[in-house]
Regions:
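A short, exposed loop/beta-hairpin motif centered on an aromatic-Gly-Thr core
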Residues: 12-23, 32
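Short, mixed-charge low-complexity intrinsically disordered segments
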Residues: 32-58
Length: 58
């Protein structure tokens, strides 16, 4: 199982950051709460056949 942090910035750029554990995903997502450049951050659980949204910050 992989985890993805999808970050949507004010300038329209979308970046994906992948992590091997939920703890790493959650740790990095906390920084998004304090950034003024980020519109939304979405935490995803990425499986072989299914992607599940875990949380949204924004």
């Amino acid at each position: 199982m992989k985890y993805c942090l999808k970050i949507i910035k004010k300038d329209g750029n979308v970046t994906n950051h992948y992590f091997s554990s939920y703890e790493d995903l959650e740790y990095n997502a906390t920084y998004c709460q304090f950034s003024t450049n980020i519109i939304k951050a979405i935490g995803l659980e990425v499986g072989l056949f299914k992607t599940k949204t875990l949380f949204e910050i924004g």
